[in-house]
């Protein structure tokens, strides 16, 4: 789609890291965002927005284990579920992406429509273990997964891999 109304970039692990080195994809994201009403990402999709130059000097978020890697792209990382900075929105992870999506639904279709959507998807979070205690986060486990994803996804891009790995 050459000029989408909205652009949403999903995240992931090795596949997303590979996408960072796909110049054609990064160029498309940059060009599509130039005309889109809104550009958004979920989870590590924000790294692709960063690679496209869309996060420079903007507040942004991503999965907590990759949060500091946003600095590599000139972003101002913030630890929030989702962030809106102008026409660019970023969500920290999958569940936070639902929060951001409901915000966008309200923006585009009104709060009543967004509430209907919330009922339609039965979104009423009740985590079985309560809220997260970020001081107890299994950082080494997730940083190990991040390092593995970067190693696999950016095997042919050693300089970028090294810069991002240093931020984990």
Regions found by a protein language model. Give the residues of each.
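Active-site-adjacent pocket-lining segments in enzyme domains
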Residues: 1-168
């Amino acid at each position: 789609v050459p000029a989408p109304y909205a652009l949403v970039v999903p995240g992931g692990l090795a596949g997303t890291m590979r996408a960072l080195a796909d110049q054609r994809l990064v160029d498309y994201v940059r060009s599509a965002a130039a005309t889109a009403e809104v550009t958004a990402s979920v989870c590590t999709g924000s790294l692709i927005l960063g690679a496209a130059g869309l996060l420079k000097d903007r507040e942004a978020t991503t999965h907590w284990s990759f949060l500091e890697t946003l600095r590599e792209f000139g972003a101002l990382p913030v630890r929030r579920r989702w962030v809106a900075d102008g026409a660019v929105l970023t969500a920290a992870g999958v569940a936070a992406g639902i929060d951001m999506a409901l915000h966008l639904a309200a923006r585009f279709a009104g709060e009543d429509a967004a509430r209907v959507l919330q009922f339609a998807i039965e979104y009423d979070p009740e985590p079985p273990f309560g809220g997260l205690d970020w001081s107890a986060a299994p950082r080494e486990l997730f940083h190990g997964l991040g390092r593995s994803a970067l190693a696999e996804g950016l095997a042919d891009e050693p300089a970028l891999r090294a810069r991002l790995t240093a931020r984990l």
